[in-house]
Amino acid sequence: MDIMRSVVGMVVLLAIAFLLSVNKKSISLRTVGAALLLQIAIGGIMLYFPPGKWAVEQAALGIHKVMSYSDAGSAFIFGSLVGPKMDVLFDGAGFIFAFRVLPAIIFVTALISLLYYIGVMGLLIRILGSIFQKALNISKIESFVAVTTIFLGQNEIPAIVKPFIDRMNRNELFTAICSGMASIAGSMMIGYAGMGVPIDYLLAASLMAIPSGILFARILSTATEPSQVTFENLSFSETPPKSIIEAAANGAMTGLKIAAGVATVVMAFVAIIALINGIIGGVGGWFGFANVSLESIFGYVLAPLAWIMGVDWSDANLAGSLIGQKLAINEFVAYLNFSPYLQTSGTLDVKTIAIISFALCGFANFGSIGVVVGAFSAISPKRAPEIAQLGLRALAAATLSNLMSATIAGFFIGLA
């Protein structure tokens, strides 16, 4: 029954996308079918197929090992505020977001910048981009951007496509925006893992987001124009560093900006949510609903969607609430509120944890529309009106992409 519910959930998400399509007759079944099959295949290999699961587990262990090295830099600055002594002092509650998550973001961003400089990232993106281009029958620029989103966030993508944006057709531009919203950057992945989200789920979600973002981009905005973009040399930075030291330093400074942005937004939004909940609870108290909150409203509204995706009804309210928070606020706040449920074993079953982890794994939220429109418009002012028109539709495509990955994850976890 649970397996069939997951299958129905996939069909429902595809049906929603079809209803939102601007040109239903021009949908490429070749690309859409290949993207869906590839997304399912990636999910199956990484979550169900024993050798694939083993490989993901080993990769997760490796990432955790790399993450542990960030504590050396954190401890040098913050001393005993980082490490097991804090857990002893506060009886297991010594995890301090500012000292554990934010430094990891800075460290990993510097590491990614260094790997770009020595050519590792470029080679990997070229190989994966070529595979996805041929498998999905899409243009080179689309596959290039989609694969790049594994490592870079939606803030960096506009700089990457800057040399080509004026030659990109409307559908390529839409796909680039969708791919950025549907994914997470490598540095942010480490931040989420630092809050207890299983790293193997984050890895699988990042890879599944590549075909999934293209899948829903192609349904909501069908490709009707030939690609005009041709290039030989791909650049990953507007001003390439001159040395490995400069690459690491530039990456660290970029990481600092990201970490500062994350801290600022999280502080502001957590406070705003508390204010809204205070107002809602106060007004609700006049009518006998003193316990009503923004989270509970999201939960009631989106619980049926969470259930059709495969979450047990007993947990559907929580899942719906977190999905709503991710969409209306951002994924970091949603993961922050999800984190306590991950710290206590037995609170949620494995399948529910997987579905929620996948559903929240993406930049698709209303705030991202402003980020994307502002960033892309800055590098191509003449296309600003066109980019603004694509924002809301891209958010819908990216959200459906994340939910599809979550539903597929629930399907394979249910089979295991």
Spell out what each predicted region is.
Residues 253-344:
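Transmembrane helical segments that form the transport core of multi-pass membrane transport proteins
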Residues 68-138:
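Hydrophobic alpha-helical hairpins/lids featuring a short glycine-rich hinge
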Residues 207-258:
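Long, contiguous bundles of hydrophobic transmembrane helices that form the permeation core
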Residues 135-193, 320-408:
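Alpha-helical membrane segments and immediately flanking helix-loop junctions
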Residues 9-20, 35-47, 105-114, 183-191, ...:
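Hydrophobic core segments of alpha-helical transmembrane domains in multi-pass membrane transport
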Residues 45-81, 230, 276-301, 314-322:
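Interfacial/capping segments of alpha-helical transmembrane domains
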Residues 126-160, 226-247, 294-298, 326-327:
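Juxtamembrane inter-helical linkers in multi-pass membrane proteins
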Residues 1-11, 100, 292-293, 356-366:
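Structural signature of hydrophobic alpha-helical transmembrane segments
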